[in-house]
Amino acid sequence: MEFGFCFAKQGGNIMRIVELTDESKNNILENLLKRSPNSYGKFESAVAEILLNIKTNGDEALFEYTKNFDKADINADNIVVTEAEIEEAYSLVDPELIEVIRKAIVNIRSFHEKQKQYSWFDSKPDGTILGQKVTALARVGVYVPGGKAAYPSSVLMNVLPAKVAGVEQIIMCTPPDKEGKVYPTTLVAAKEAGVDVIYKAG
């Protein structure tokens, strides 16, 4: 059996296609899996430090990190995306792209509807009731990357499964650009998908 996969060079258009045959797969997979879990230790400690700082100092620490990492001046007054910002985003996004997003929403919803689980109960002659109760979470948070990785699909694939499952409130966090704005297509996708609150953080 043969499999194929490819590597894309970041920042360029060079793509190397690798044929994964029985003869080559062990060597190729070994090289791909060489990265040791221990190599992530420095990142884990950095993340732990950030979490502790935010837990200790709250929003002020979050605003400081947003300034350091995203170069954006975010505070309590502008961290939540407003309806005016969403309306502006619609004016900046090509109507054809908005239509594509809407069609994608229909397709993604249809797929996840087929995965949906339902409550069921069964009564036995002796009065015993067996069953399963499926209850959606009341609230979930989703993270959507920004910058060069700002894809509307990231919004849809995070939000729509939760909506189909019956989640009542969806809160989205996404990093702003240095002007404190969120990528317009991200905002349009979030609005179309049914996100309730969007925070400029991440």
What are these regions (language model features)?
Residues 55, 173, 200:
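Active-site-adjacent beta-strand anchor residues
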Residues 13-137:
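N-terminal Rossmann-like NAD(P)+-binding subdomain of aldehyde/semialdehyde dehydrogenases
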Residues 122-188:
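Conserved small-residue-rich beta-alpha loop and adjacent elements
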